Amino acid sequence: MQCCRMEGEIMNQRVGRSSIRLAQPVCVIAGASIVGKKEGEGPLGALFDMVGEDDLFGCKTWEEAESNLQKDAVYMVMEKAGWKAEDVSYLFAGDLLGQCIATSFGISAYNIPLFGVYGACSTCGEALTLGAVMAAGGYAEHVVCVTSSHFASAEKEFRFPLDYGNQRPLSASWTVTGSGAFALGLNQKCRAHITGMTPGRIVDYGLKDSMNMGACMAPAAADTIERHLEDFHVQPQEYDRIITGDLGSVGQTVLIDLLREKGIDIAGRHMDCGIEIFDADAQDTHAGGSGCGCSAVTLAAYILPKLESGKWKKVLFLPTGALLSKTSFNEGKSVPGIAHAVVLESPVVK
């Protein structure tokens, strides 16, 4: 199916059942990453724009600290893009807390029209998808996308108070303290191009273990990857990397096995942001990192530079989310997953 507008206007193209190919790529003009001390001590520590000395970031509460992460990340990415707040048409932002309070308190001072989005740890992919479509459609000149998470605020929201000192199983992940922000627009200097996307569907295999979110999210990632390859008529080898957000070591194994059952082999090209951001053994993070800050800061600090330099030509970036809450968990509900895929390509032509 092809959707056209009048001559002279931008044409976008829908491909397959549920994917979009942008007729005019959207530029990722800049990315910014701010993380906590633990993330700064990990393998990617030297790549982040800013590393906090402690996880309160000079604030009185964990939630206020996360709000400051978003505020500072948005300021930093606008500064990199050469924009002021009044130059930004729309802001797409989200976090893990109830009613997205980290977002609403964090970016309120900018006075930018806000689309608050929530897809759990897939929120970065959702924000980039919606922001890119808005820019590609000619509805916005400048767009900022930002997501955040915080280990302590997430533990308080979804699990146990830190003072409780509960033991975590090896399948558990460690919520990343960090915020990643991105400036999007058309016909501008690019660090990478957004050329297409495959929005995720809710996939529920009936798993109820909130301490094994990688396994809960892996079926959704497999579903999105399979649909993406079918819609775009491409093979995994056409991507330098297929990058999930925070499946961790357990979820990675499940994802690879699920796709192999469908005749799709991504083992040699799969990368997971949650595995990359921590040294699981040295930092005792078990299955790896998680949170909607995990994929965002890894994209800004690690993935974009590889695309900008031309070392990677094309990647499929799909943050993964576990759609649970305290209420759903306590009522015995399962943990559905979702994964939004975004195609990122290098601006370097060789």
Regions found by a protein language model. Name each.
Residues 3-4:
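Cysteine-centered motifs
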Residues 8-63, 161-226, 231-234, 265-284, ...:
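Condensing-enzyme catalytic core mediating Claisen C-C bond formation in acyl metabolism
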Residues 28, 62-121, 238-253:
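Conserved beta-ketoacyl condensing-enzyme motif
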Residues 66-82, 130, 216-231, 298-303:
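Short, well-ordered amphipathic alpha-helical segments that serve as non-catalytic structural scaffolds
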Residues 94-99, 121-122, 147-153, 200-201, ...:
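Acidic, glycine-rich active-site loops and adjacent beta-strand->loop/helix elements
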Residues 104-107, 247-262, 327-335:
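Short glycine/threonine-rich loop-to-helix capping motif typified by GTGT followed
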Residues 104-156, 160-172:
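A generic, well-ordered mixed alpha/beta core segment in the N-terminal half of proteins
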Residues 118-145, 182-184, 290-311:
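Active-site-proximal alpha-helical scaffold in enzymes
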